[in-house]
């Protein structure tokens, strides 16, 4: 592990200035922390996308975490984008993530286009390349650097290093954008994203953070963290949740609850 961390720092020290794509997840947080350690805060900026794809709780947590960990010196640029204006994204094919990542990282790069020495960094890790991730193609095409992947860091490695560094989100469940909750082929609409965000926020407030509310065709598929499943099965939260999503216009079958 020490060798991988040393390799990460060594690769970062070769760069003059960097911009880290920061989401608030453990991968991008560790990468940003390592970049600040290797280069100093004045040579690092964080770029954070603000859009309808970020849940309200996720957005608040990301900004609060940044303010706690990097109170001085590191600039945070919040970049507003409108994915619902990207027709190739809204169509929601199996290449949705490719189109989104390509648009988003182009926009990030445009933010510092005059600073030719500044490189954009992404928090992809070694486990990500073992999965189907269309966004990886966009990362390669745009020549975005992936220092965690290059250092051979797995998700488990990253969580351990984040814990050792005192990063409070080291055990935070992985959280993708709200569009991933909509079944492939169904158009991405603002109304759907709002309902997903509202349902997941309800579960979070009820003591089930990290739950996912998926819309597959006309059915709801709910994912609850493994350690919380037993409690979810026996508490009155089920009835409260059923009432809540009914008010949003959805029926719900508790046979469609799985662990994540």
Where are these regions (language model features)?
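ATP-dependent adenylation/nucleotidyltransferase module used to activate substrates
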Residues: 1-164, 205, 220, 236-251
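Conserved beta-strand segments that form the floor/walls of ligand-binding pockets within enzyme
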Residues: 21, 177, 223
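Generic alpha-helical secondary structure
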Residues: 105, 189-196, 234-238
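Active-site beta-loop-alpha junctions enriched in small/polar residues
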Residues: 125, 216-218, 258
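A short interface-forming secondary-structure element
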Residues: 217, 221-234
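Short proline/glycine- and acidic-rich turn/helix-capping motifs at secondary-structure junctions
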Residues: 253-260
């Amino acid at each position: 592990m020490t060798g991988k961390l040393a390799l990460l720092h060594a690769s970062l020290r070769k760069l003059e200035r960097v911009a880290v794509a920061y989401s608030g997840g453990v991968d991008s947080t560790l990468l940003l922390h390592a970049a600040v350690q290797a280069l100093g805060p004045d040579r690092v900026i964080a770029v954070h996308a603000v859009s309808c794809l970020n849940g309200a709780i996720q957005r608040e947590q990301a900004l609060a975490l940044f303010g706690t960990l990097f109170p001085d010196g590191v600039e945070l640029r919040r970049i507003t984008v409108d994915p619902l204006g990207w027709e190739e994204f809204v169509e929601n094919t199996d290449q949705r993530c490719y189109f989104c990542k390509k648009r988003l990282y182009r926009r990030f790069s445009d933010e510092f286009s005059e600073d030719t020495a500044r490189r954009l960094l992404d928090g992809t890790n070694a486990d990500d390349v073992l999965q189907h991730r269309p966004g990886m193609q966009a990362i390669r095409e745009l020549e975005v650097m992936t220092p965690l992947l290059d250092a051979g860091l797995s998700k488990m490695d990253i969580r351990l290093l984040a814990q050792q560094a005192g990063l409070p989100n080291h055990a935070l469940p992985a959280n993708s954008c709200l569009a991933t909750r909509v079944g492939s082929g169904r158009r991405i609409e603002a109304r759907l994203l709002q309902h997903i965000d509202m349902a997941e926020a309800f579960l979070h407030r009820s003591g089930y953070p990290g739950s996912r509310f998926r819309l597959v065709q006309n059915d709801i598929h709910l994912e609850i963290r493994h350690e919380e499943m037993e409690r979810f099965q026996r508490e009155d939260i089920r009835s409260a949740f059923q009432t809540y999503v009914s008010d949003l216009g959805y029926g719900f079958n508790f046979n469609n609850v799985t662990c994540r």
